[in-house]
Amino acid sequence: MSLAIRAAGAADHDAIWAALEPVIRAGETYALPRDWSRETALAYWFAPAHEVFVAGETLGTYFLQANQQGGGAHVANCGYITSLAATGRGVARAMCAHSLERARERGFRAMQFNLVVATNTRAVALWQTMGFAITGTLPGAFAHPTLGDVDAHVMYRRL
């Protein structure tokens, strides 16, 4: 999918919140409080350490940051959310490809996803096609709202 991806700004807050809110409220894929307000969610998404992007007409959004400080600062970390209306249209794949390139441009040497919920099988499969490997599984690390405690994966790839 060819999709214009650009840096996000304050003018994108409404559209980004429209993508974030249903995912946060569902509580099935992100370890974020389900009752977060718009202001709290946007403050998290636009944290000073995050470089934030939007895809297309805000079909999705992602942030890029260093996974750790000091000796771990060469490893990138991202969070991606695709709007419900754009699910299955290649938006997450396009954002991941963009983030890998942007991470290389910023000098990162690897990328790590810290908590990929194992029941989010579409995301796990997508990240694997993008070159990520499951390097660890955390038993019962995610409190799913309907399934109870489910496993979460740490996924990693070199850049």
Residue ranges and their predicted role:
Residues F113-A123, A141-A143:
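Conserved beta-strand-loop-alpha-helix junction that forms the acyl-donor binding cleft
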Residues G88-E105, V124-T129:
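Conserved acetyl-CoA-binding loop-helix of GNAT-fold acetyltransferases
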Residues Q128-T137:
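Conserved acetyl-CoA-binding loop of GNAT-fold acetyltransferases
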Residues S2, Y80-I81, L115, H144-L159:
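Terminal substrate-recognition subdomain of acyl/acetyltransferases
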Residues A4-I16:
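A short beta-loop-alpha structural element at the N-terminal edge
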Residues A26-T29, P33-A85, C96-H98, R102, ...:
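Acetyl-CoA-dependent GNAT
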Residues Y80-A85, R89, V117-T119:
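Active-site acidic-Proline motif in GNAT/NAT acetyltransferases
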Residues A103-V116:
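Conserved GNAT acetyl-CoA-binding A-motif
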